[in-house]
Amino acid sequence: MVNHGASKGCLTCKQRRVKCDEGKPGCQRCLRRGRECGGYEKPPATLKFKPQTFSYTRPGRRAHIIDRANSAKDSSDSSPPISRTPSPPVVDCALAFFLGNFAGKGRGFASSRGFFELLAPALAKEPQDSPLTLALCALSTKVLKQWQEDPYSFNKPHRRLAHAYARLRTAIADPNESRSQSTVLAALVFQFHENLSAVFSMQKAQRTHHDGAVALMNQHGAELLSTPYGRHMVRYLMFVEIAAAIREKRPFPTSVLSIPEIANTPGNPSAALDLIGIAVANVQHRVTSFAERLALEPLLERDLEPILLQLDNIHIRLLDWRNTVFKAWNPIYVPKVRETNPPIISYQGDCDIYPDVQISSIWSNWRSYRIVLFKAALILLRQLPNISPRVVQVAYGEPQDIQDLEQTTRQSIQETFDAMCRVVPFCMGNRTRTASMHDMVAVDLHFPSYHDPGTCDPSALEQWPKDEMLSLANHLGHIKALGAWHALTPLSFMLSVCNDEYGSLVAESLRPGQLQWIRKELARSVLVLSMRKSAPNSPTSAQSSPSGQCGTTGTTPTEEPGSSGAGNPDDNDTLYKMSAHEVEQLRGSLRLSGGA
């Protein structure tokens, strides 16, 4: 047999001991099976060190070393010492950047949905070779590289990630490690990575790791729920399932409901809102099924009464949630954003500001639940235009003309869309270029916040505890890292809810030009997050050169501060035309990650 030398296959195929097709940049065998290709990097060479200490040198060589040392000492008497402090390892820099800006600032257990807030405390207790440690190190280094060097590098093969995958499979097969909370959390980290990969490549995210985490929680639920961390993870899984059920118009899955005590762990206002979200998902599925039945057979008005009553009861629960939420969570209305260069982009010149983007995201979820209910009501009213006022009275407590009820519902949709649009200036500010490490120190980026002098009414700020408000530096770091993600979620929802079978009922409720503005803002957030490369012959966005070490950017922008670059909002519709299918896939991947 001819010896062709060492295998040239990818690291994943080598570990699995299967033949690799050696495709570049990733092999097709891995891609077809939904595996992460480990790439073709050679393992580090084994180094052999030769002793070079004084006792190991030859006598003649020792004399030469002594002469050089004495000479260096004499010359150093007249010159300052040179600092040779070693730079931190790349992994340490990456963890500090990711945990600090994405999982630290602006997050807390009071508003937590149970994922990002757990990472740093859990990592502190983990050994270096645990699945969670390896997964976080791999994810963090990919995120840091994307910000430092190449905004389109996230989906390139990564050897560290392939090693972490192998370690997770070992942990799941081990009876003791599979019961560990850190193993479940590691699976969620891998799912978060899968979601980011899908978003950046505009593809549909797979649920493999999420379903695995659900299976582990169901298998060891009672044990895992005995700790606060375990209960937080259950809430996170519940939120992701609610979002997926609403997007896919299906009921909340019984597989998640089988997790013990899920309904008895509200914990905080965001978790209480998620419990209402279960009812929203179920009634949406019920209305959709009802509309499909109407197309096949006539139904009686009494079949409609319980559905209208259910819609109204859920809406009352949503209004009660708003009235009982922390006062510190209430948004502050700003009638006019301040002037900057480039300008802060807003729909009608106004915006809302929040304590942080995580709380703004929770309010966006609340508004999206209301939109789902309003849309369901319009579907029923449109399907049964001759419904009697008596049926409406049963559901709403008073007789109403059907046309008046429909007009009131459309007005509520318009007001809710306006509120969701007011989130965008808070999250996006005046950003018009692809995000890079330079943005963390850039002085030309501006965001409406409670730190802006004259922006907020001082009496309105009194409802926010000052000891819980972020410093200006922490707020800017937090919103530059996560703001575009939290704008992307409501923007993709608003477009998606207008694109499906009954989307015209919602779109007809909006004022002219509003959907076009939403499309442009979605395109701007896509540009900032580098989800697509610029179109041919388009202007070049501000990029950063490879940075130095931890925390120092070492960047040189290719544009002057304030220049428009690739992010000229007037060009976004041309550069980034997204189909309804792409918007729906984007929304699905975002929701599977918990909205980032």
Regions found by a protein language model. Give the residues of each.
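C-terminal effector modules of eukaryotic transcription factors
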Residues: 305-596
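Short coil/turn segments at secondary-structure boundaries
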Residues: 42, 148-151, 201, 377, ...
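Eukaryotic basic, amphipathic alpha-helical target segments in cytosolic regions
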Residues: 34, 38-41, 172, 221, ...
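Amphipathic alpha-helical interface elements that mediate macromolecular binding in regulatory proteins
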Residues: 8-11, 28, 162, 211, ...
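Charge-rich, intrinsically disordered regulatory segments
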Residues: 1-130, 157, 557, 574-595
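Intrinsically disordered, low-complexity acidic/Ser/Thr-rich segments used as protein-protein interaction/activation
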Residues: 82-100, 104-319, 323, 327-361, ...
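Amphipathic alpha-helical interaction motifs in eukaryotic regulatory proteins
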Residues: 11-14, 28-32, 38, 137, ...
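Residue-level detector of short, conserved catalytic/binding motifs and their immediate flanks
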Residues: 28, 134, 184, 369, ...
